[in-house]
From Swiss-Prot:
Its EC number is 2.5.1.55. It is found in: Cytoplasm. It catalyses: D-arabinose 5-phosphate + phosphoenolpyruvate + H2O = 3-deoxy-alpha-D-manno-2-octulosonate-8-phosphate + phosphate. GO terms for cellular component: cytoplasm. Its main location: cytoplasm. Pathway: Carbohydrate biosynthesis; 3-deoxy-D-manno-octulosonate biosynthesis; 3-deoxy-D-manno-octulosonate from D-ribulose 5-phosphate: step 2/3; Bacterial outer membrane biogenesis; lipopolysaccharide biosynthesis. This is 2-dehydro-3-deoxyphosphooctonate aldolase. Pfam families: DAHP_synth_1. Keywords: Cytoplasm, Lipopolysaccharide biosynthesis, Transferase. One of its GO terms (biological process) is keto-3-deoxy-D-manno-octulosonic acid biosynthetic process. Coiled coil: none annotated. It comes from Xanthomonas euvesicatoria pv. vesicatoria (strain 85-10) (Xanthomonas campestris pv. vesicatoria).
Length: 276
């Protein structure tokens, strides 16, 4: 599949979607995007910058949600033009899709909205590539009808993203079989290595996370075989305004990505034949 200006798929090298969870300031986004561009350029990795203008599903009603649509799009546009990288952001049911699509290169649907038929169709009808996150409550094989809805709009540039499955209260687990199952949708599969270690609502008024397991799950997913990796990152996760406990430190991204690219090359060298 053609994504932005590069090809993605199991016959192509791993690509990266990364950035801070939420837009905190113009300077932070430019700094992070610039550093990620340096890292990915050095390693030869195709890169899409990600950040959100509105986090609509925060645990607490008083938590920081972002700068909002107008200011958020200004920041994303600046990243795109000044840093020279494609940008992705997530949208919601109330989002003016065409307005966002005029700025960003890739749209993303939140996991909690994966079953909202009209929403999925509206996003995909905007004509941009779409990364559809699998709900924490959804079986991987149930992504096939979601993809069918998406492609009914005529948009063939659809990706599916695994971000963990609910496992009791305040916990997620990553079933690596889902990565293989979701290939049957015919779409590139992306693994979200940072939200997969989230502990939803685990700190009472906010979500916790176990960032030490980000490289563990990322390595496992790459070994199974994925098209892309999604990872939220921050220069100082302890001070991040959203999802800090599961964000990967920016100063450790190069080391992690270097390892993952080596694993990706070995995995894809041997193919993905099904064994009965």
């Amino acid at each position: 599949m053609k994504l932005c200006d590069f090809e993605v798929g199991l016959d192509q090298p791993l690509f990266l979607i990364a950035g801070p969870c939420v837009i905190e300031s113009m300077q932070l986004q430019l700094d992070v995007a610039g550093r990620l561009k340096e890292i990915t350029g050095k390693l030869g990795v195709n890169f899409i910058f990600k950040s959100s203008f509105d986090k609509a599903n925060r645990t607490s009603g008083t938590s920081f949600r972002g700068p909002g649509l107008e200011e958020g799009l200004k920041v994303l546009d600046a990243v795109k033009k000044q840093i020279g990288v494609p940008v992705l952001t997530d949208v919601h049911e109330y989002t003016p899709m065409n307005e966002v699509a005029a700025v960003v290169d890739v749209l993303q649907t939140p996991a909690f909205l994966v079953r909202q038929t009209d929403f999925i169709k509206n996003v995909c009808a905007a004509g941009k590539p779409v990364n559809i996150k699998k709900g924490q409550f959804l079986a991987p094989w149930d992504m096939k009808p979601v993809v069918d809805k998406a492609k009914s709009t005529g948009n063939e540039q659809i990706m599916v993203c695994e971000r963990g499955a609910s496992f009791g209260y305040n916990n997620l687990v990553s079933d690596m079989r889902s990565l293989s199952v979701m290939r049957d949708t015919g779409c590139p599969v992306v693994f979200d290595a940072t939200h997969s270690v989230q502990l939803p609502g685990g700190q009472g008024s906010s979500s916790g996370g176990q960032r030490e397991f980000v490289p563990v799950l990322a390595r496992a997913a790459v070994a199974v075989g994925i098209s892309g990796l999604f990872a939220e990152t921050h220069p100082d996760p302890s001070k991040a305004l959203s999802d800090g406990p599961n964000a990967w430190p920016l100063d450790r991204m190069e080391e992690l990505l270097e390892t993952l690219m080596e694993l990706d090359a070995v995995t894809k060298k041997h193919g993905f034949a099904r064994f009965a």
